[in-house]
């Protein structure tokens, strides 16, 4: 025994991996082991057969089929299971990897014994795996599932996030050059997409080898298929024409939303949040027929492809989001319509109380030594009269629009039938319109305050004998005349005395504007929640984690030491690692980081301190994740017609 051990230790010991289905092969079975030889060191066991002739007939029948959903041609017999002696079949077996497996009880592990066809001593790794069921949309994957269309043509390459991602990929490629390549016979090198694809096909191959080939082909069934197919064709044609009609209406609305009267001017999407929301929903509606046809072809051809699963999850996640959005919208719409008078009265009170009266009272209060501050009376009265005039003009305009308030509330309520997101977008637009006077006062005060700071900074440079060189973008020394210094001193003194008064009014209007922007940010957060929440993915994660994998998890089960008639065997469990909550809400966290980095960033704080206007977050940053699930160029009406009636090639493949 010691001599054998020494010889084995001196010789190079190979490691072979056998992927064993955990639930499909029982200890009571016996016969030949059928599977794939992925490589010299990787064997995938699928099932057992009792007769080689039936297996040969199965290969002949299915190899004639051109539209194969699984890899049948490379199937072979890998060895025997619970057989007393090695019985070599015909020519469809692998002599260099022939294995002899025994399993005595249900709780015991399968043991691989030495045979004459395996002269070398090897170490075995038997990996138990659960064959994923394709009809239940189960599959294994090495990488987390992505809901985005990861194609170069669909990615905005001008986005800073894309540039950062490209930079990280370049660094990773350079980092790999500093490390030697691993050996082929290692876990890192053996786990490849081809092997995972074979594991995904194992369940369907087992069902094909054990299925009953008796098919009902009587005249009654043929007649029923003929009548039902003609009936379905008639209704499908009507439905296809209806989809094309809706596509034409969508195209007209999309052209109106994206129309620019003058090149480089603003369109409706750049001005209104509701227009952006309508554009998103119509773009999704244009892409849904393409997604549905791809899924229909996928189910008809019985293909097993991870990309089809991703398309399935993307499609139904959008449908569930839109369905829940409409449910919430109809609920809110019914509540508003039932309490129309109360809602109208509440809106009028809020608008005139907080947006008009309180702002007007604040401006008047700033004239009379606010918080004990002694301000310049003349400047205070001038700014106060100008601000009150703007507020009164806007108040009179709102009073003229007051009879239209019930109608506008009804419009917002009816928009809820298009989804709660559209209602929230309209509320955000109405809030922006109702507070135009606050925005104008904030812009005027910020411009005045920023201009005053710039002039004071320039006068400080004058006292230091410096002058800004605009052509070279630097500060050079300069000798000023006496009259220039005297005039600069007078202007500096006047501006310094005016600065507290200007700053107080600017701070008041900036605080009011920040309050309005906070309300708009809340609306944007709610829109992001309704547009990006992974509802369908969360339901799949709770119902069946195998449908949203994010990798593989290997766990050591047992170890059998080296024996005289066997091999040193390590038993492992290969389980699909479901997608974590962090990965599911990764896009949501990106949106939260964008909102926080925009409104609570250092740049925003500095802009408020120096009087630079703080704009709202760009719509591209708020919606680009949802648009990433859509193609950049929507399908044309002609291609949609060809796809529905002639089933031509998909435009986004």
UniProtKB/Swiss-Prot annotation:
GO MF assignments: phosphatidylinositol N-acetylglucosaminyltransferase activity
The keyword Membrane is assigned to this record: yes
Transmembrane regions listed in the UniProt entry: 43-63, 237-257, 327-347, 382-402, 407-427, 485-505, 520-540, 605-625
One Pfam entry name: Gpi1
Pathway(s) served: Glycolipid biosynthesis; glycosylphosphatidylinositol-anchor biosynthesis
Alphabetical UniProt keywords: GPI-anchor biosynthesis, Membrane, Transmembrane, Transmembrane helix
Any one GO CC term of the record: glycosylphosphatidylinositol-N-acetylglucosaminyltransferase (GPI-GnT) complex
Membrane topology: Multi-pass membrane protein
Entry-linked PANTHER family: PHOSPHATIDYLINOSITOL N-ACETYLGLUCOSAMINYLTRANSFERASE SUBUNIT Q (PTHR21329:SF3), PHOSPHATIDYLINOSITOL N-ACETYLGLUCOSAMINYLTRANSFERASE SUBUNIT Q-RELATED (PTHR21329)
Function, as annotated: Necessary for the synthesis of N-acetylglucosaminyl-phosphatidylinositol, the very early intermediate in GPI-anchor biosynthesis.
Protein name: N-acetylglucosaminyl-phosphatidylinositol biosynthetic protein gpi1
Organism from which the protein derives: Schizosaccharomyces pombe (strain 972 / ATCC 24843)
Lineage of the organism: Eukaryota, Fungi, Dikarya, Ascomycota, Taphrinomycotina
């Amino acid at each position: 025994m010691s001599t054998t051990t020494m010889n084995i230790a001196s010789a190079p010991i190979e490691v072979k991996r056998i992927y064993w289905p955990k639930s499909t092969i029982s200890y009571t079975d016996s016969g030949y082991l059928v599977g794939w030889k992925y490589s010299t060191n990787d064997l995938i066991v699928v099932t057992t057969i009792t007769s080689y002739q039936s297996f040969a007939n199965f290969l002949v029948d299915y190899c004639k089929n051109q539209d194969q959903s699984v890899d049948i041609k490379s199937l072979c017999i890998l060895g025997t299971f619970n057989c007393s002696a090695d019985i070599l079949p015909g020519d469809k077996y692998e002599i260099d990897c022939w294995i002899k497996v025994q399993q005595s009880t249900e709780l015991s592990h399968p043991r691989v014994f030495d045979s004459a066809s395996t002269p070398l001593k090897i170490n075995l790794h038997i990996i138990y795996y659960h064959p994923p069921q394709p009809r239940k949309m189960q599959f294994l994957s090495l990488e987390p599932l992505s809901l985005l269309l990861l194609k170069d043509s669909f990615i905005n390459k001008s986005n800073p996030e894309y540039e950062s991602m490209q930079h990280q990929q370049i660094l990773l490629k350079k980092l790999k050059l500093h490390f030697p390549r691993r050996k082929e016979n290692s876990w890192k090198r053996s786990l490849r997409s081809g092997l995972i694809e074979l594991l995904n096909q194992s369940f369907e191959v087992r069902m094909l080898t054990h299925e009953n080939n008796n098919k009902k082909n009587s005249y009654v069934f043929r007649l029923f298929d003929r009548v039902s197919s003609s009936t379905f064709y008639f209704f499908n044609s009507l439905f296809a024409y209806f989809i094309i009609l809706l596509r034409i209406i969508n195209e007209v609305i999309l052209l109106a939303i994206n129309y620019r009267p003058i090149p480089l001017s603003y369109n409706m999407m750049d001005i209104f949040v509701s227009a952006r929301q309508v554009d998103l929903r119509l773009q999704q509606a244009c892409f849904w027929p393409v997604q549905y046809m791809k899924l229909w072809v996928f189910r008809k051809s019985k293909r097993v492809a991870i990309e089809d699963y991703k398309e399935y999850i993307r499609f139904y996640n959008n449908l569930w989001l839109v369905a829940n959005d409409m449910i919430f919208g109809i609920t809110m719409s019914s509540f508003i319509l039932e309490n129309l008078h109360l809602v109208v009265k509440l809106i009028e009170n809020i608008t005139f109380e907080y947006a008009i009266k309180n702002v007007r009272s604040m401006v008047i209060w700033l004239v009379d030594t606010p918080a004990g501050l002694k301000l310049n009376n003349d400047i205070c009265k001038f700014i106060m009269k100008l601000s009150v005039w703007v507020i009164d003009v806007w108040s009179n305009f709102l009073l003229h629009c007051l009879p239209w308030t019930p109608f506008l509330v009804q419009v917002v309520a009816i928009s809820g039938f298009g989804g709660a997101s559209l209602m929230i977008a309209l509320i955000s637009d109405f809030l922006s319109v109702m507070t135009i006077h606050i925005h104008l006062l904030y812009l005027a005060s910020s411009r005045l305050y920023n201009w005053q700071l710039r002039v004071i900074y320039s006068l400080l440079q004058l006292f230091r004998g410096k002058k800004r060189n605009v052509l070279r973008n630097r500060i050079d020394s300069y000798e000023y005349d006496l009259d220039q210094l005297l005039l600069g001193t007078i202007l500096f003194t006047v501006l310094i005395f005016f600065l507290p008064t200007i700053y107080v009014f600017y701070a008041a209007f900036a605080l009011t504007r920040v309050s309005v922007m906070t309300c708009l940010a809340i609306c944007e957060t709610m829109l992001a929640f309704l547009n990006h929440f992974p509802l369908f993915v969360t339901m799949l994660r709770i119902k069946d984690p195998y449908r949203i994998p994010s990798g593989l998890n290997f766990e050591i089960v047992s170890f059998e030491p080296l024996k005289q008639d066997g091999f040193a065997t390590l038993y492992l469990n290969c389980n699909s690692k479901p997608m974590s909550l962090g990965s599911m809400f990764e896009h949501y966290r990106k949106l939260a980081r964008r909102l926080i980095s925009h409104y609570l960033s250092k740049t925003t704080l500095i802009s408020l301190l120096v009087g630079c206007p703080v704009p709202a977050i760009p719509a591209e940053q708020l919606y680009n994740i949802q648009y990433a699930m859509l193609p950049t160029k929507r399908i044309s009406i002609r291609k949609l017609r060809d796809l529905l009636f002639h089933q031509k090639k998909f435009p986004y493949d």
